[in-house]
C-alpha cells in the first residue's frame, strides 16, 4: 500500500503589521484558497479595530474562518483552536480548495501543524483539589502566580481566570516534573500536513514605524470607542481583554494613565510583541523567510508555494 497523501496547507506567519493579510488574500485568489485565521484574538466578536481584524472589503469574497466565533466574555484554549482548525482544513480540502493559515500566534499555529496531544488524564486529584481550594480562598491570581514561578511560558499563554487550565498546567508540573510548555515542544517532530511555511520580515526600524502608524490609524478609526463599548458592558478580567490594544486602553478608563500614556504604551507593547513573534518563529519553526522591506514579493512567494506543494495557480499557463 502506498503512503497516505497528506493534505496540503500553506501557512503565512510573521510579526504584526508586516503585511500578512494582503498577501494571504492575493495568494488565496491565485491558488484557489480559503483562509483560516491563525490569530488568537481575531476570534472575538466586536473586537475589530484593536485586533486589526480583516474587513469584509479586504476579504474580497475569499472565505475566512476562525474570525468572530466567540464573545469577549468567553475563554479560548489552544486545544479548541487545534480541533476547530483541523476540521476546517479537512473541509476546505474536501471542497478542492487550498487551506491557507495566516496569523502571528505561533503556538496556536504550531499546535495545528504538528502532532500535539492535549490530554486531560486523571493526574493527581488530591493536588488538583488543593489548588482549586487555594484559588477559592486566595484568588485566581495567587494560583496563576504559582504557575508563573514554575512555567512562565504557559502562564503567559493561559489567562489567570482560566482556572481549570492554570491548575492543569500546575498539575502536570507537579506530577511529571516537566512544564506543560516543554511537553508540547517534545511533540513538535511530526508534521501532519504537506506544509509550505512562509514568513514575512522587514527592516526592524521600518516595521516599528509601521506599527506606530497602525496604532495612530486604529485610534482614528475608533479604537477608543470600541474599547469603551467593552468596558461599559462590564467586561473585566477576561482572556480577550489581555490583548494588546485593549489592556492599555482599559488602564485609561480605570484612571491609571492618561490617554496619551495609554497610546504610547500600546505602541511600545506592540513593538515588543513583534520582536517576540520574530524570535519565537525563528527558534521554533522551520520557516522560509521573505524580506518585504523593499516591497511585496507576492509573485516570488506564489512561485515558491507552487513548487513546494506541487500546485498550479490561476496565474499559471
Swiss-Prot record:
Cofactor: Mg(2+)
EC number: 2.5.1.75
Leading EC class: transferase
Catalytic reactions of this protein: adenosine(37) in tRNA + dimethylallyl diphosphate = N(6)-dimethylallyladenosine(37) in tRNA + diphosphate
Keywords: ATP-binding, Magnesium, Nucleotide-binding, Transferase, tRNA processing
Source organism superkingdom: Bacteria
InterPro entries: Dimethylallyltransferase, IPT, P-loop_NTPase
GO molecular function: ATP binding; tRNA dimethylallyltransferase activity
Residue sites binding substrate per the record: 16-21
GO biological process, one term: tRNA modification
Site feature location: Interaction with substrate tRNA: 105, 128
Region (Interaction with substrate tRNA): 39-42
Family statement drawn from the similarity comment of this UniProt entry: Belongs to the IPP transferase family.
Job of this protein: Catalyzes the transfer of a dimethylallyl group onto the adenine at position 37 in tRNAs that read codons beginning with uridine, leading to the formation of N6-(dimethylallyl)adenosine (i(6)A).
Alphabetized PANTHER family for the sequence: TRNA DIMETHYLALLYLTRANSFERASE (PTHR11088:SF60)
Protein name per the record: tRNA dimethylallyltransferase
Organism: Bacillus cereus (strain ATCC 10987 / NRS 248)
Amino acid at each position: 500500500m502506498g503512503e497516505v497523501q497528506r493534505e496540503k496547507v500553506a501557512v503565512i506567519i510573521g510579526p504584526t503589521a508586516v503585511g500578512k493579510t494582503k498577501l494571504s488574500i492575493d495568494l488565496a485568489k491565485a491558488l484557489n484558497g480559503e483562509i483560516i485565521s491563525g490569530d488568537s484574538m481575531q476570534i472575538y466578536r466586536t473586537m475589530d479595530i484593536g485586533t486589526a481584524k480583516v474587513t469584509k472589503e479586504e476579504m474580497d469574497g475569499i472565505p475566512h474562518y476562525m474570525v468572530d466565533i466567540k464573545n469577549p466574555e468567553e475563554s479560548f484554549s489552544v486545544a479548541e483552536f487545534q480541533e476547530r482548525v483541523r476540521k476546517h482544513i479537512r473541509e476546505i480540502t474536501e471542497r478542492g480548495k487550498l487551506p491557507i493559515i495566516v496569523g502571528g500566534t505561533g503556538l496556536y499555529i504550531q499546535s495545528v501543524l504538528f502532532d500535539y496531544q492535549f490530554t486531560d488524564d486523571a493526574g493527581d486529584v488530591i493536588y488538583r483539589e488543593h489548588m482549586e481550594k487555594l484559588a477559592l480562598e486566595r484568588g485566581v491570581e495567587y494560583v496563576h502566580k504559582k504557575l508563573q514561578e514554575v512555567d512562565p511560558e504557559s502562564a503567559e499563554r493561559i489567562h489567570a481566570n482560566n482556572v481549570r487550565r492554570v491548575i492543569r498546567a500546575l498539575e502536570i508540573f507537579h506530577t511529571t516534573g516537566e512544564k506543560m510548555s516543554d511537553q508540547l515542544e517534545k511533540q513538535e517532530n511530526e508534521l501532519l500536513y504537506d506544509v509550505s511555511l512562509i514568513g514575512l520580515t522587514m527592516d526592524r526600524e521600518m516595521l516599528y514605524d509601521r506599527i506606530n502608524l497602525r496604532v495612530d490609524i486604529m485610534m482614528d478609526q475608533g479604537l477608543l470607542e470600541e474599547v469603551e463599548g467593552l468596558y461599559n458592558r462590564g467586561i473585566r478580567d477576561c482572556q480577550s481583554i489581555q490583548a494588546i490594544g485593549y489592556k492599555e486602553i482599559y488602564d485609561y478608563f480605570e484612571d491609571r494613565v492618561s490617554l496619551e500614556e495609554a497610546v504610547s504604551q500600546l505602541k511600545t507593547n506592540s513593538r515588543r510583541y513583534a520582536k517576540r513573534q520574530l524570535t519565537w518563529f525563528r527558534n521554533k519553526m522551520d520557516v522560509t523567510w521573505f524580506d518585504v522591506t523593499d516591497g511585496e514579493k507576492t509573485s516570488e512567494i506564489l512561485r515558491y508555494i507552487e513548487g513546494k506543494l506541487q500546485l498550479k495557480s490561476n496565474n499559471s499557463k
